[in-house]
């Protein structure tokens, strides 16, 4: 059973649940701190990693795909590497429809395949926390609305690493809906003055096909459903009902029947994300 993101992860004020998780957070932090780091340089091929330190919903997969498209227009032979997870077939399918994808249980096996097929640049969708690989360029993606949530490490908060780890990376990508990023930029520069900061804004490519004169029931099983809803609202899409499922949710026939029935009862159209 997949669970939704805990609400207290994005609570800006200290709360009891986070405090109760502190002992486990400290334990996991110490394990990570003393884990042997063997940063092997990836030979024979250039590598770019697009990852995050806030777990889920930061826009790294769309950014990886767009980065791949840009490099292809520059005539580079590219591919995207994603570690295989049985419960992430939605992202695997999304990427494979748009780019050459290597998706093995071990990233090193995907690297070997890319080299064998004479790729010039490989883009890792996720992988910043894999300590035995040293990438040529590393991007850290954030969602500007959530930023770092409550600022605590897992499981008390949503962070895989604290902000001090930004000193190890090449650039930050702030994905959002046009929110002010001044405070975020200042925080980033405290930990790495030289780091490059890029900003993107979510812009649905097929928004003109969606009639804003109609009512919509929307549903999604993504890392940040609030951003999906906000993007539609900014484009003047009238949302009557919003249904939220866990990230990487595997929809059943019964789920689809319920969604269709609810839309029929509400007399609305149905709208979801490309990944869903």
Residue ranges and their predicted role:
Residues 77-81, 140, 215-219:
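Conserved beta-strand elements of the Class I
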Residues 2-46:
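A transmembrane-helix-recognition feature enriched in membrane-embedded lipid enzymes
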Residues 210-253:
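Redox- and metal-dependent alpha/beta enzyme cores, enriched for Fe-S-associated oxidoreductases
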Residues 27, 61, 95, 125, ...:
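Residue-level signal for inorganic ion chemistry
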Residues 36-87:
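Walker A (P-loop) phosphate-binding motif
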Residues 86-192:
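Phosphate/Mg2+-binding loops and adjacent switch elements
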Residues 250-266, 275-276:
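A short, acidic, amphipathic alpha-helical segment used as a generic capping/interface helix at domain edges
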Residues 171-180, 200-205, 219-223, 246-251, ...:
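G-domain G4 guanine-recognition motif of GTPases
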């Amino acid at each position: 059973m997949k669970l939704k993101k805990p609400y207290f992860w994005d609570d800006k004020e200290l709360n009891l649940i986070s405090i109760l998780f502190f002992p486990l957070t400290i334990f996991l932090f110490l394990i990570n701190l003393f884990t042997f780091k063997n940063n092997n340089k990836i030979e024979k091929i250039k590598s770019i990693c697009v990852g995050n330190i806030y777990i889920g919903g930061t826009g790294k997969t769309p950014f990886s795909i767009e980065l791949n498209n840009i490099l292809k227009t520059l005539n580079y032979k590219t591919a995207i590497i994603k570690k295989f997870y049985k419960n992430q077939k939605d992202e695997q399918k999304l990427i494979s429809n748009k780019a050459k994808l290597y998706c093995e249980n071990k990233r090193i096996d995907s690297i070997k395949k890319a080299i064998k097929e004479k790729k010039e640049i490989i883009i890792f969708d996720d992988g910043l926390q894999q300590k035995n690989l040293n990438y040529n360029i590393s991007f850290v993606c954030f969602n500007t609305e959530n930023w770092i949530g409550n600022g605590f490490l897992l499981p008390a908060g949503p962070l895989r690493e604290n902000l001090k780890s930004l000193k190890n990376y090449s650039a930050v990508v702030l994905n959002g809906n046009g929110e002010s990023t001044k405070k975020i930029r200042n925080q980033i520069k405290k930990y790495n003055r030289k780091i490059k900061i890029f900003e993107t804004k979510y812009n649905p490519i097929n928004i003109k096909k969606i009639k804003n004169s109609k009512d919509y029931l929307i549903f999604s099983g993504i890392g940040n459903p609030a951003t999906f809803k906000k993007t539609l609202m900014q484009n003047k899409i009238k949302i009557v009902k919003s249904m939220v499922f866990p990230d990487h949710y595997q929809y059943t026939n019964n789920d689809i029947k319920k969604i269709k029935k609810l839309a029929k009862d509400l007399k609305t159209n149905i709208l979801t994300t490309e990944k869903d």
